[in-house]
């Protein structure tokens, strides 16, 4: 399969992994919209949420909830956007959630390795 996220999940493309279990992998976005922008990727290749069973949806959102708490502790954002893209807005055809912290004060995007270390040091 020629899916970027499947290659990241299998490890043939490196990523900054924040969390991983049998169902999902959470990584830092390589082109972040904000400091702390992360992706929750189901390990099974799924293109649309309609393909997900209720248990998997609940697990993905449970992990997203835990990541939200971690992002708030590590980065102290003023809010968070949770996004799914479908159809024309879905660049990579592998279902995933974006967690994008938002800040009242404009911030420059800093090195994602620095952000990664901040997040990992909270655990």
Language-model features: locations:
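HIT superfamily nucleotide-processing domains
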Residues: 1-123
């Amino acid at each position: 399969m020629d899916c970027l996220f499947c290659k990241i999940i299998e490890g043939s493309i490196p990523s900054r992994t924040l969390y991983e279990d049998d169902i999902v992998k959470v990584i830092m976005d390589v082109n972040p919209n904000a400091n702390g922008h992360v992706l929750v990727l189901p390990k099974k290749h799924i293109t649309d949420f309609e393909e997900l069973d209720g248990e998997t949806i609940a697990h993905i959102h449970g992990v997203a909830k835990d990541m939200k708490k971690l992002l708030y502790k590590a980065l102290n954002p003023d809010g968070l956007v949770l996004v799914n893209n479908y159809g024309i807005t879905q660049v990579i055809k592998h279902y995933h959630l974006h967690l994008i912290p938002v800040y009242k004060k404009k911030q420059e995007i800093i090195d994602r390795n620095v952000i990664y270390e901040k997040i990992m040091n909270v655990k």
